[in-house]
């Protein structure tokens, strides 16, 4: 089974044993190699892209997905329907025809392998400008944001990232200090429950308040609450975050600091998410906060200076969710139109692998 960070693209360099790009583990990263300023992006001229050439060979539905402009777009794409090609051509169309800067694009995939493939495809269409885009996993994108915003939550920018093994080892120490028998109270089970809570954006204080009395929680739940609080405290003492913290903490910052949310909404005017059916609740909220609009941090439609919502394009297939064990819920794809009432849906139905 692959990890969220497996097979990093060439520019990411080596990965740790846990599969995290080594640049994500330290303060220095690809930002040093790929400066994201507008001046730098404009200097990277790239090659001219003919819109008709980009659209050539696409069927009607694929063309519509590539040139869509305006409100949110859900692309429902079955296996072999050419969704990767559509995403790559859409990004190239944004860069070559609509005048979008590479740094204004955030494309989220579920593996670094997919991110590398996407970047290579776009580079093949528009040239080296593709290097300035953010094409990466949810976790990698959050690492880059958190390196910049760490002080907002009392962290140093060189915070460590605990992988699953590190997290379980810390949980074992926490349970030992609570005098709990590891044979009866399995550290892995506790870690899994904490992960589930974070995927639902339930922090340690919220959970403790929820189960803090005999009327509202069981003895087991109160033990979990104590373990969760102690675990988080020890993470912070070590200037560290675990995998699930990367997303939850980024969401917390975006929601608590409207100026930070506005900064990234102004930056990322085009957000594309692949395999949307595999997103969990925390990832869904992260996308919503980055896009902006009603119900998000700092948004007020009657404020003249408010940043309008970015263009959101998500691709998914409700029949293919493979990350349920990580808290993914196909509710996010099934209720997309409810969450975004002005959304358009395009079906990619032709299977090119079987023709």
Q: What spans do the regions from the language model cover?
A:
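Interdomain hinge/linker at the junction between the two RecA-like core domains of SF2 helicases
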Residues: 340, 345-346
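Phosphodiester-processing cores and adjacent nucleic acid-binding clamps
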Residues: 93, 102, 341
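ATP-binding Walker
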Residues: 81-82
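Conserved P-loop NTPase-based nucleic-acid remodeling module centered on helicase motor cores
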Residues: 102-193, 198, 202-208, 215, ...
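Conserved helicase NTPase motor core
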Residues: 51-67, 71-76, 85-87, 99, ...
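Basic/charged alpha-beta structural segments of nucleotide/phosphate-handling enzymes
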Residues: 3-6, 13-14, 18, 23-24, ...
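A conserved segment at the C-terminal end of the G1
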Residues: 88-92
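Acidic, low-complexity intrinsically disordered tails
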Residues: 1-52, 297-305
């Amino acid at each position: 089974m692959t990890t969220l960070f497996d097979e990093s693209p060439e520019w990411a360099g080596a990965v740790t044993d846990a599969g995290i790009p080594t640049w994500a583990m330290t303060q220095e990263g690809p930002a040093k190699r790929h400066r994201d300023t507008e001046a730098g992006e404009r200097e990277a001229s790239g090659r001219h892209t003919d819109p008709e050439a980009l659209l050539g060979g696409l069927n009607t539905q694929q063309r519509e997905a590539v040139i869509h402009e305006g409100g949110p777009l859900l692309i429902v794409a079955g296996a072999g329907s050419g969704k990767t090609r559509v995403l790559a051509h859409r990004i190239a169309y944004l860069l070559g025809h609509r005048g979008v800067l590479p740094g204004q694009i955030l494309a989220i995939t579920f593996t670094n392998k997919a991110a590398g493939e996407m970047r290579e495809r776009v580079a093949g269409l528009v040239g080296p400008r593709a290097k300035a885009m953010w094409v990466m996993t949810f976790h990698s994108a959050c690492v880059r944001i958190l390196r910049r915003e760490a002080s907002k939550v009392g962290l140093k920018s060189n915070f460590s990232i605990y992988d699953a093994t590190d997290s379980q080892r810390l949980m074992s120490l926490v349970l030992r200090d609570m005098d709990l028998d590891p044979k009866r109270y399995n550290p892995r089970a506790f870690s899994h429950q904490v992960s589930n809570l974070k995927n639902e954006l339930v922090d340690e204080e919220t959970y403790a308040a929820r189960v803090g009395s005999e009327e509202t929680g069981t003895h087991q739940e109160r033990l979990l609450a104590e373990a969760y609080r102690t675990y988080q405290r020890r993470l912070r003492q070590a200037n560290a975050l675990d995998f699930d913290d990367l997303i939850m903490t980024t969401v917390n910052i975006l929601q608590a600091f409207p100026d930070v949310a506005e900064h990234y909404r102004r930056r990322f005017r085009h957000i594309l998410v692949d395999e949307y059916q595999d997103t969990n609740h925390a990832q869904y909220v992260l996308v919503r906060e980055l896009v902006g609009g009603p119900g998000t941090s700092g948004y007020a439609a009657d404020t003249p200076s408010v940043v309008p919502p970015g263009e959101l394009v998500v691709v998914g297939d409700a029949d293919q969710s493979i990350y349920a064990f990580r808290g993914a819920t196909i509710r996010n794809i099934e209720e997309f139109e409810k969450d975004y009432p002005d959304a358009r849906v395009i079906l990619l139905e032709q299977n090119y692998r079987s023709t």
